[in-house]
Regions:
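Conserved, structured C-terminal
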Residues: 1-24, 28-30, 36, 101-340
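Acidic, proline/glycine-enriched N-terminal capping motif
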Residues: 1-89, 94, 210
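Well-ordered mid-protein domain cores that form the structural environment of catalytic cofactors
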Residues: 69, 74-127
């Protein structure tokens, strides 16, 4: 078995007694002080995550027309200095990956999921899009939480929400994956120490991928491989708002048919008021409509179990019945985000 890839911050993680997990071929910190504590750091103050395992690709703006044929969102009319969340779709309209684009005057930075990095690169090359893969030559740090911008204003210019900035050292955006405000910062390995020294001397706490997952779930954000996959379209995942590309793109015929007919599987958010947790793969029914849990966990903030479930078609009731280890547990579909 090949050795795991190591983050450029691996020695920092060891020094700070991180517990590691193998994620998409990378050895990454799962937690330091514990997932619940780290979850609380980000919800109440600030925390920072090493997300250097995520793929980072530069694409020249001359490729935008070709790139537009592969994603469901309108990147052609994206302003310089803005970020865009979008989804690469296949010919069936399903998700190859969900990604973030940062657009600058002459190029775009594409950030993709670690597990899909090779797949996205191959997909771009297959469609003759020239790229510059920069994952190994950079690090990516996410600083998140209600106090994160106040903290980082002592170090960087703070852009508007969903905007991106590039200076001589840092390329960053006011984006994130926690439901809190914050920055995602890309930096060359030569300049990484300055950023980490600032963060470690500040009030921000290091956080691992365990808290990142509970935070994203609590914020009603999808995770590729669970709420999105090569068998789930953006429409089925409740991400119709991302479909802003008015031109033809790969799988757009399928997606438009789903929008017009409503005939498709559908993802729903749910809560369970008891202590029972409906985890990934748990069977669930909404009346006679069967479904399966894609993600489920306990919410430290809401003090209840929450999750996503994928149903074969639109449920006719919000009342749910889960089969949790042979025991029937009641829950309900909710229409709003878990956290407002």
């Amino acid at each position: 078995m090949p050795d795991s890839l190591l983050s450029p911050l691996h020695s920092y993680h060891i020094k700070n007694k991180a517990k590691f997990i193998d994620f998409a071929g990378w050895s990454m910190p799962f937690s330091y002080d514990g997932t619940i504590k780290e979850h609380s750091y980000v919800r109440t103050d600030s925390g920072f995550f090493d997300v250097s395992h995520m793929g980072r690709i530069e694409i020249q703006n001359s490729e935008i027309d070709n790139l537009s044929k592969l994603i469901c969102s309108d990147i052609k009319n994206l302003d310089e200095g803005k970020a865009l969340y979008s989804i690469f779709t296949n010919s069936d309209g399903c998700a190859i990956d969900d990604v973030i684009f940062w657009k600058f005057s002459d190029h775009i930075v594409l950030i993709c999921n670690a597990a899909n990095s090779s797949k996205v690169i191959d997909h771009l090359k297959e469609h003759l899009i020239s790229i510059n893969e920069i994952t190994q030559s950079t690090a990516l740090i996410a600083v998140q939480g209600p106090n994160s911008l106040n903290l980082m204003s002592n170090f960087l210019q703070i852009p508007d929400e969903f905007s991106c900035v590039k200076n001589d050292i840092y390329t960053y955006a006011r984006t994130g994956y926690t439901g809190e405000d914050g920055l995602e910062i890309m930096v060359s390995l030569d300049n990484l120490d300055n950023l980490i020294d600032f963060l470690t001397s500040s009030e921000a706490k290091p956080c691992g991928l365990g808290a990142r997952d509970t935070l994203r779930l609590e914020a009603s954000l999808p995770l590729y491989g669970f709420e999105l996959s090569q068998n789930i379209t953006p429409i089925e995942a409740g991400l119709k708002w991302t479909v802003t590309n008015k031109n033809a793109f790969l799988g757009s015929d399928v997606i438009n048919e789903q929008i017009n007919t409503g005939n498709h599987q559908i993802l729903k958010k749910f809560t369970i008021d008891s202590k029972s947790i409906a985890r990934t793969g748990t069977n669930v029914k909404a009346g006679n409509t069967p479904g399966v849990v894609t993600s489920g966990n306990y919410s430290p903030i809401l003090k209840k179990s929450i999750g996503f479930a994928l149903f074969e078609n639109q449920p006719t009731t919000d009342l749910l019945e889960f089969d949790i280890r042979g025991k029937l547990v009641e829950g309900k579909i909710i229409k709003k985000r878990f956290l407002s």
